[in-house]
């Protein structure tokens, strides 16, 4: 059986793959195009059961660093002009763990994905005409 540590390791690999994919498209940036990330953010579908390791991984404190690394990696390479999350608030299910938070009244101390996004946000400029 897979454990939470292994799931988190797979998320870290996925972050590196996504940054690499964005770098592969960097030639578009040279032509004054900007990368807009639509429906971005973590997914990590699981079985939807109570003991689902994927859901546990999304709730794990290490997700803060994984998401911060993702956003910072994209920004560091000049690859993000806008990011549109699939959903900012949503309960995990067998279809994925899309939300940065699971409920609008979730205690931020227990929302590591939201913390990771907030940690990486200060340098983001406002998006004009959006």
Question: Where are these predicted regions, by residue range?
Answer:
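Structural recognition of the beta-strand scaffold that forms the well-ordered cores
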Residues: 34-38, 81-86
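Noncatalytic carbohydrate-binding groove/subsite architecture in carbohydrate-active enzymes
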Residues: 1-35
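Aromatic-rich peripheral "rim/lid" segments of glycoside hydrolase catalytic domains that contact
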Residues: 48-69, 73-74, 84-130
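Alpha-helical structural signal in soluble globular domains
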Residues: 25-28, 69, 73-77
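Catalytic metal-binding/acid-base residues of hydrolase active sites
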Residues: 41
């Amino acid at each position: 059986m897979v454990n939470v540590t292994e799931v988190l390791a797979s998320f870290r690999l996925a972050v590196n793959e996504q940054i690499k994919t964005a770098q592969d498209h960097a030639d578009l940036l040279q032509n004054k195009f900007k990368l807009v990330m639509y429906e971005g953010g973590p997914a990590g579908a699981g079985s939807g059961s109570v003991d689902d390791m994927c859901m546990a991984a999304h709730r794990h404190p290490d997700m803060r660093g994984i998401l911060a690394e993702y956003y910072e990696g994209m920004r560091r390479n000049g690859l993000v002009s806008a990011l549109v999350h699939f959903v900012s608030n949503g309960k995990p299910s067998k279809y994925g763990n899309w939300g940065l938070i699971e409920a609008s009244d979730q205690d931020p101390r227990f929302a590591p994905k939201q913390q990771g996004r907030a940690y990486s946000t200060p340098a983001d400029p406002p998006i004009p005409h959006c």
